[in-house]
Design a protein with these regions (language model features):
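N-terminal signal peptide c-region/cleavage motif recognized by signal peptidases
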Residues: 16-18
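Extracytoplasmic copper-binding redox domains, predominantly the cupredoxin/blue-copper superfamily
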Residues: 21-145
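Bacterial N-terminal signal peptides that target proteins for export
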Residues: 1-7
Length: 145
């Protein structure tokens, strides 16, 4: 009986956090507001505990993290082609995401967790020129909003 009361108290203490968690949808598109081969939106703000779901609206896309663009404590992920991928945000910071087949076309996006700024060296990761230019544009837009 005592153990049940402790378990119930623990669940009640955690309930507000799970109730506040949001699900954020990101579409993988051949064409969107920002041009061709894009994530939409290209910049999202999330909080620890939120889930970001990448939706393969158009075929030929995936979503995966870029080495060196994931905060400590956050798991990297590699989504399969044409498959939905759900990612729980577990650490504050900035997460860089790419569609591997369309990296050279600049198909990238940023998840900002907890209002964090891009850490120094965030754009130092190895990536095609168009991807880096897209990240610079996305970060500038995100800072302005």
């Amino acid at each position: 009986m005592k153990l049940n009361m402790i378990a119930a108290a623990a669940l009640m203490a955690l309930a507000p956090y799970s109730a506040l968690a949001e699900t954020i949808e990101v579409k993988m598109l051949n064409k969107g507001e920002a041009g061709v081969m894009v994530f939409e939106p290209r910049f999202v703000s999330a909080e620890v505990g939120d889930t970001v779901v990448f939706l393969p609206v158009d075929k030929g896309h995936n979503a995966e993290t870029i080495k060196g663009m994931v905060p400590e404590g956050q798991d990297s992920f590699t989504g399969k082609m044409n498959k939905e991928v759900s990612v729980e945000v577990t650490s504050e910071g900035m997460i860089g995401v790419v569609c591997k087949p369309h990296a050279a076309m600049g198909m990238v996006m940023v998840i900002q967790v907890g209002g964090a700024d891009a850490p120094e060296g965030f754009l130092d990761a190895k990536m095609p020129r168009k991807a880096k230019e897209a990240f610079e544009e996305i970060l500038a837009e995100g800072a302005a909003s």
